[in-house]
Amino acid sequence: VVLLAGFPIAIIFAWIFDKTPQGFIKTDADITEVDGMNIKVDNRPFYLQKRNLFLALGVIAGILIGTYGGSSITKSVDDKSIAVLPFDNFSKSEDDEYFTDGITEDITMNLAKIKDLTVISRTSVMGYKNSTKKMKIIADELGVKYILEGSVRKLGNRVRIVGQLIDAKSDKHVWSDSYDRDMNDLFQIQADVSKEIANAMQAELSDQTIAQIETVPTDNMEAYELFKKARTYQYRSFRETDFNLAVDYYREAIELEPSFALAYAGLSEVHDFIIWMGYDISENRRKMVKYNLNKAKELDPQNPDVRLANAIHLYRQRNYFPAMDEYRAVKELQPNNSEIWERIAFIQYRVNQFEESLNNLLDAYKVNPKSPRLVVQVGLGYQLMFDYNNAIKYYDIAINLAPDISASAYNYKSQCILLRDGDYDLSLEVLDQGILRTSDKNSIWSKTTRLAQQGKYQDALETLSKEKSDFGNFLSNGAVIPRELLMGICYDGLGKKNLAKKYFAQAKDKMEQQVQNSPDDHRTHAGLGVVYAHLDLKDKAISEGRTGLAILPPSKDSFFGVYQVMALAYIYMIIGDHNSAIDQLQTILNINGGITLDHIDNLPEWSQLKKHPRIIKWNKTKQQS
């Protein structure tokens, strides 16, 4: 209690704020300029520094509260909060698990449309499937008052759904009912259940909300089951294999029901994500995004899920503010949809609103605390503001939630360990854990590049042999490079010059073709620049790096644009122009989403710059402050 009550108050106010007649404002230390870099230094004596006075007062307050205060701090629970647990599948076929899970999701999404309720996301409750935990424990873990549980039995063209609403604290059954109807009435059953629960919880239902809940997405139930399978894989992880399975199921659903707007919208989202992650940036993939999105808009332009797909596409085209408008419009219709808060947060840290972004992610986390993907994004929000302790905390939560699919959590955690501690061995150990549990392509590429940058060329080649992809991300997704470049670097380091020359030539040909295929993609230009740099084609390397940066500067995207600055800096470093490399890095130094001196000191890709006089001078000033 002492620590909880005293220290956070002292730390938050003392380290961040000053009291002024206008209220609390951020504390600013004296500014010292060193070789063009601004470094904050507080030169006042210890006893005159407000942060230390507040810290002392916080300790005293904590002791007083611990001695005389209450015995515990209780977590408040919203009186109209609910979690819909995965319904039990009482059907004979295991294939009906997707069908049963789909009903759970539909009822959850219906309730999420009711502004008067707080509804835990479907992603967070699926971990309780087949759980033997008591209702009160589950409710405490999810922070809700009510639990809805039920069962589904599908037999031929009939479906029986049983549901009961429980006040978890008192273990009192607030509502229960059963429905035994034809499969064609499924959506009406789900709507009836949702409205009955809302009434039992005394939630206000508007006519608009009722109309949304009663909307029928398709008359083809077989297509709808395939659609639900697709959504399961779409939101399962960031892995390419899951996205590919989602694509297959969406396509099957569309084959059965060519007028299924939501299936087209979902397919467009997955294709968009495959491009965004760098798995396939071909023009053909881009055409598939546009075709499916346009088809969805043509079929049902005002559907919230279609508008959500449109917002996602606008976002990925970096039309951020139109995307924000679409997201906010959908949020009015789906106020409990954590995905929308998450998407708004993504925009915010791309338009330099990092604190606002993190706040939205934390709000989303409250209603979706068991989603590994969302938890990773919360960790990234902290990492972008250089709070590595909190970042690692959330990455660990994601890994514990889903150790076999949270590939990005291992990767980001590995980065944070390097940045915070400079612990190269532990960083690689975390990557190895991720590779062992997930076989993730990006983790294998990250380990390969780190080993090569450390001069462990044979180990790098052995690691790369575990992943057969032609291309991979480099410099945190700032560039796409071919595997032949890494092989050339390794063989060159091993003294096998002829082999190195062969692979460098292949890398050059492949990247030039990539640029020709995707001339507007910043990552391909940056990747070609990196290849040219390693071939000592200096002018060409700089030109490609500058082109990548011109396509996506930080002013256009304060998240990914920073990586283009890094790519150009890396190119300058490889060709031996270290001053120009440092000039580039200086433009993103100590800004949220950028880099700190820890990046230069601890990340192996910047090892050539560590002993540069400018870096030494900056570090000396940092230590003195």
How should these model regions be labeled?
Residues 80-90:
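Short beta-strand segments enriched in small/hydrophobic residues
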Residues 198-209, 300-301, 458, 539-542:
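Proline-centered turn/helix-capping motifs that create local helix->coil transitions or kinks
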Residues 1-63:
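An N-terminal, helix-rich hydrophobic module
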Residues 314, 327, 331-332, 356-625:
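Alpha-helical protein-protein interaction modules
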Residues 45-46, 51-79, 93, 103-249:
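Catalytic-center loop of serine/cysteine hydrolases
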Residues 223-352, 366-377, 383, 549, ...:
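Short coil/linker segments at helix-helix boundaries
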Residues 76, 209-228, 298, 473-479, ...:
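TPR-adjacent "capping" and linker segments in tetratricopeptide-repeat scaffold/adaptor proteins
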